[in-house]
Amino acid sequence: MYYELSKHKMITCFSKHYDVSEYPEDLNREYYMISTGINENDWKKLVSVMKKLHAKFICVDVANGYMKKLVEFVKRVRASWPDVVIVCGNVVSREMVEELIINGGADIVKVGIGSGSVCTTRIQTGVGMPQLSAVAECSDAAHGIDGAIISDGGITCPGDVAKAFGGGADFVMLGSMLAGHTESAGEVIEENGEKYKVFYGMSSSTAMNKYHGGVANYRSSEGKTVKLKYKGSVENTVMDILGGVRSTCTYIGANRVKDIPKCCTFMRVNRQVNTIHNGKEV
């Protein structure tokens, strides 16, 4: 996936479950970020990975960013590698964005709780915030203190990418839109003549069984595992996304992505698209 996305100057965020030996040697540091959790074993692995790669971007990745331990870990990363770009999250409110940037030393905050397509956090816990509202609030906070945000979750089509930029996001993270392709992780499976790929959330029982030896008896799964129709090469999807955002810019008069928030207006609607001929495509 990295090799295909980097052709379009898109950044690949490697999973924090990657072992040191799994990282290729020929990575362009402009187009990938390594990820880490916040426990001591995560720190030891991060040190080993940085010795091998000297990465430009480090993503401190936890489902619940409202922890003092996250802020302290980000401080530790900043002290050890003063020149790296630190990404951390996830959060959905102004106060925590300011805490992570001002006191933690983060450069970019990842925004989104419960909005992912294979996330069930809002069902299991009742916790979350509508993604566009979170992006608008958090980007306003970050930009006021020379920081940036990534909108993480809730993207279903190229138009959603454009809306995330319109809400103030500096970056947009994609999961399900890039799943199910040749370059995506997992084997292609065939059933009744149709090809599929399995896609699962990182808080699902599938992920916890794979990486943590099962779901701990004090918690529940907060993700699901789904079977997606095989989509072929990711190149087609990437070109569709980029083409959609370019067209957004022409419709609203934005000369560049950075101008989208200044050129767009959001309106609340009951129906976004006309669906009268859905299912009749040829």
Where in the sequence are the language-model features?
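Alpha/beta catalytic cores of nucleotide-metabolism and tRNA/nucleoside-modifying enzymes
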Residues: 104, 126-151, 155-282
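Active-site entrance/lid segments in N-terminal catalytic domains of soluble metabolic enzymes
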Residues: 1-148, 176-181
